[in-house]
Amino acid sequence: RKIILKQNKTLKDCLENTIIPDLFKEGVNFLKWKDLKESEQEQVSQHFRVSILPILTPLAVDYGHPFPFISNLSKSLGISLLKPNSGEKIFSRVKIPDEISQWETVREDKNGVSFINLEEILVNNLHFLFPGTEIVDKMIFRVTRNIDLEEEDEYAEDLKEVIEEGLREKKFSPVIRLEVEDNSENWISNYISSELELSGEDVYEMSSLANYTSFGEITKINRPKLKYKSWTPRIHSDFVDEKANIFNKIKSKDIFVHHPYESFNHSVERFIETAAHDPKVYAIKITLYRTTINSKIIDSLVYAAQNGKQ
């Protein structure tokens, strides 16, 4: 717990005291709602009503609606509301969508470009989501579920079956951590903790719940000066001929490929793709640590599985 909190503080300090100030000097700005002009607030609110509001689903908890399921590592907005008639405080949850852009461009001119984060847009436009209802407070939070395999499962006779079952069940595995913002309103945090049966040790007040990977969107702006030159790997001499049978190449000799200096696409990806389409291949066994979002290897493995290969 201490290590995680320390790491989070280090990341936040690096972002807020180094990266963001350095980008500001280069004309790349990150704005809060209060930084926007009135016309800009209306522009962003219009974007919210047209493009974001239709995909949001608020789930309020009352006698007829139980506490909603919250998926692993998804960020949510917890909101405390007052019922119009009784004045009773109730909880509502809105999942923060990750399928859409996390950054909205507010200004872009010769002086630079300014962005506002999706979460900042959400918390300042909740009145469109809950018209006529008093919003008492709101809090961004995230849960972590236990998706580890049990130790005895690692030695099961059919590990493939265990993994498949684990993947099905992990969605509903127990929550082991609740992350909330620093100085979050206690009622919301306590309510969520109670519903998820968490103790105080399971609740982490984080200095930032920022999704640091979302900053990858910012790299798409046209600022060559701020980017490293793209790396173009060379193609290994044995794989230059794309029509040559890769299995024949491997049969003739061992081939050593050095990544990232030599192309992964023309070697490993090509090897897996060829295996997936070759009728003489009955099984593909590979250990993948992680893949990119649009991985050609995953596409090849899916194709192989759909065509009866193990």
Where on the chain are the PLM-derived regions?
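N-terminal localization/anchoring segments of enzymes in phospholipid and broader phosphate metabolism
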Residues: 1-310
